[in-house]
Amino acid sequence: MEEYKALLDEKMDRVLLSLDSEYKSLRTGRISSALFDKVLVDYYGEKTPLTRVANISIPEARLIVIQPWDKSLLSKIEQAILSSDLSMNPSSDGSVLRIKVPVLTVERRKEIVKQAKKIAEEYKVAARNVRQELNNKAKKQEKDSQITEDDLRRILDDIQRDTNSYIKKIDEIFDLKTKEIMEF
C-alpha cells in the first residue's frame, strides 16, 4: 500500500510542478521574464525558446528589454512576440527590442483568469488520469491474487482520498493565481 502512496505522490507532484510552470507563463499584473518561456523563435530552421537566443531584462516596472545574442535574429524575435498570445508590441532600435508593457485592463485580466481556469481543469484531468492508472494497477494485482479484496478496497479508498487532496491543491493554486491576476 505504501508503494501506491509513493507512486501517487511522485506523479501528482509532477502534475503540480507542471501546473506551476504553465502558470508562470501567464501574464499577471507583475512582469516576469517567464512570460516569454513559450515564445518560440525560428533559429536556423528550428523552433527555439526565446530565452535560449536572447537575454531578457526588466530594467523598469513596465519595460522589458530583449537583447538577442545574434543580432540577425532581431526581426525573427519580433515576429515571434507579435504572433504569440502575449498582446505585446516590441519596438526595435537595431540592436535590442524594447517592450513597454501597458497596465492590464479588467477585460484582459478576466480573459487571463478564464485561461488559467482552463489550464487548471486540464491538470485536474491529468490528476484523475494518475488515479485511474493506479486504480487499474491495484485491480490487476487483486485479479492476479497478489492482494486481497479488502486490501484492494483500502488501496482504492486511499488513492481517491489522496487524489481529492491534490485536486484541492490545484484549486488553491488556481485561486492564488486568480488573485494575483486581478490585483491592480
Swiss-Prot record:
Which Pfam families does the entry link to?
Answer: RRF
Leader peptide range in chain numbering = none
Q: Which GO terms describe its biological process?
A: translational termination
Among the entry's GO cellular component annotations, what is one? cytoplasm
One GO MF annotation is: ribosomal large subunit binding
Function, as annotated, reads: Responsible for the release of ribosomes from messenger RNA at the termination of protein biosynthesis. May increase the efficiency of translation by recycling ribosomes from one round of translation to another.
Regarding protein family, the annotation reads:
Belongs to the RRF family.
Full protein name = Ribosome-recycling factor
